[in-house]
């Protein structure tokens, strides 16, 4: 098997693990373990905490002691153990700590899998810019296949989803042993601990425009996890209505939600056109408005014929909502920041979105779900409208306060480096 095919298998398993539980664990905890919305939000906040803590620490470990593929293997072994133990947990506090251990091991593997891919492709004489995207798309395929597997097997409300994820983690840990050796990076002279942890980019907060950008990245990051956490439980709740109890939406909610991941692939292809034609600020605004539509369609969607169309539209606009901010935000950082701290700035952007923002969003969204619940019955329409109003308010404030001048010729140079 050629190196490209081997990396595709790695990418497939990397995201198959996540897809096995990320979208459905909330439903398992609410419906089977009887957790509250706040409990579920707390458990999912572990992902945000891990995204804040682990990348810098793992970077130091990989730099000093471990080759990338060995660090990758050890992380997935820890994931396998944590996910296996999670199948036995029935209280929210223990579940939080177990899933925090899992997240602290899993989150660094995303960057490590990219590093392994780039190194192997370069060693094989291939251009990572053109060769990596076809490898990475197998990750999205793996995520979707996992969602379909759990849904079609009727495991969305069962701890069996965690057994599947644990088994896939163990398989990937063993598979990592077969990957080519990645040499430890050469030590850079006079590299401070601050630089190793990526903290030197915090100087950017002295720039008002960058400070506003990172603040909005954090606030938008708060909405990214909401539908991962509560989208599946929302669809399962239609089972309370006898009219919808046997509907496709109730039986296979993850299959419906997987349309969101399919839409991501499609919208990624449109980003270069929209960035060059409209500029970064407009594309980021499109993302915020798409989040408003995502939640708004959820508020009025249901398994009826018209309601199903609204749910389907919600899945489609998710691709725009998710991709347009993440990609255009990364391009903005690439374009605006000095090359000496560009990598740290990209790390800070991801930390604000997937770390601080996701952590805050998971906790507050869980509280909001409980606030609009009476005797365990959730007022989903109000819940989604509140989230839609938040996204719309962000869009309006962003349009007013974020100043940006579109320069297509400058942008075209930046988008070329984005593939790295």
Where are these regions (language model features)?
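Multi-pass alpha-helical transporter architecture, strongest
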Residues: 6, 85-89, 169-181, 355, ...
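Juxtamembrane intracellular "pre-TM" segments in multi-pass secondary transporters
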Residues: 1, 180-215, 240-245, 418
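Helix-loop boundary and gating motifs at the non-cytosolic
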Residues: 1-48, 209-245, 252, 326
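A membrane-interface helix-boundary motif in multi-pass transporters
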Residues: 152-168, 367-391
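Cytoplasmic membrane-interface "Motif A"-like loop-to-helix N-cap segments
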Residues: 63-76, 276-288
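C-terminal ends and interior cores of transmembrane alpha-helices
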Residues: 77-91, 289-304
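Cytoplasmic helix-loop-helix junction between adjacent transmembrane helices
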Residues: 100-138
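Hydrophobic core of transmembrane alpha-helices in multi-pass small-molecule transporters
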Residues: 12, 82, 92-112, 116, ...
């Amino acid at each position: 098997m050629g190196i490209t095919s081997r990396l595709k298998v790695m990418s497939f398993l990397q995201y198959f693990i996540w897809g096995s539980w990320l979208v459905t664990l909330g439903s398992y905890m609410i419906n089977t373990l009887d957790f509250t919305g706040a409990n579920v939000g707390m458990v999912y906040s572990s992902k945000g905490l891990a995204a804040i803590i682990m990348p810098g620490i793992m970077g130091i470990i990989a730099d000093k002691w471990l080759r990338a593929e060995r660090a990758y293997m050890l992380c997935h072994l820890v994931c396998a153990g944590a996910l296996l133990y999670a199948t036995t947990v029935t209280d929210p506090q223990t579940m939080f700590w177990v899933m925090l251990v899992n997240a602290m091991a899993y989150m660094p593997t995303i960057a490590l899998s990219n590093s392994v891919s780039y190194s192997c492709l370069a060693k094989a004489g291939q251009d990572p810019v053109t060769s990596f995207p076809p490898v990475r798309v197998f990750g999205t395929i793996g995520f979707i296949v996992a969602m379909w597997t759990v849904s079609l097997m009727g495991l969305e409300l069962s701890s069996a989803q965690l057994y599947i994820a644990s088994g896939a983690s163990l398989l990937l840990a063993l598979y990592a042993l077969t990957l080519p050796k990645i040499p430890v990076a050469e030590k850079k002279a006079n590299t401070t601990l601050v630089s190793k942890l990526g903290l030197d980019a915090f100087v950017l907060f002295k720039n008002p425009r960058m400070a506003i950008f990172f603040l909005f990245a954090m606030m938008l990051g708060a909405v990214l996890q909401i539908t991962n956490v509560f989208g599946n439980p929302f669809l399962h709740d239609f089972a309370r209505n006898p009219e919808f109890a046997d509907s496709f939406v109730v039986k296979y909610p993850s299959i419906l939600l997987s349309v969101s991941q399919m839409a991501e692939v499609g919208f990624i292809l449109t980003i270069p056109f929209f960035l060059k034609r409209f500029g970064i600020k407009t594309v980021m605004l499109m993302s915020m408005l798409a989040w408003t539509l995502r939640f708004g369609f959820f508020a009025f969607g249901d398994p009826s014929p018209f309601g199903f169309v609204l749910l389907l539209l919600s899945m489609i606009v998710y691709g725009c909502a998710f991709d347009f901010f993440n990609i255009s935000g990364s391009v903005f950082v690439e374009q605006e920041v000095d090359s000496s701290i560009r990598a740290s700035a990209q790390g800070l952007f991801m930390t604000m979105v997937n770390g601080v923002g996701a952590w805050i969003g998971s906790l507050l969204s869980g509280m909001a779900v409980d606030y609009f619940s009476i005797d365990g019955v959730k007022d989903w329409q109000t819940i989604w409208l509140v989230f839609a109003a938040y996204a719309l308010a962000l869009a309006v404030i962003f349009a007013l306060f974020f100043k940006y001048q579109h320069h297509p010729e400058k942008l075209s140079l930046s988008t070329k480096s984005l593939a790295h």
